[in-house]
């Protein structure tokens, strides 16, 4: 479990949620991500991120994702525990459904160069 470092931008939020935790582990599953019949990603090297107040999320290495199907968007969000997230879309029905922390905070640096998918927009198979 990472110990979160304080800086002036993170301090107000981190002090309000003192027992927040994030755990990152290597998944033991073969993961396939599909949108309909389209295989978006397939990996044996995914990570699973367990975070307070969130469902577990699989993060897959960029090299295992068919990035040619995705279009980067202008959306950027901020998480005081992970950093700034960038997003990708597949089509008008799948807007901003893939995200990545390109420069995550040191406590979660393992997810650098990994992407995750909103599970309500894709089918994730585990084998």
Where are these regions (language model features)?
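Terminal leader/tail segments of proteins
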Residues: 1-127
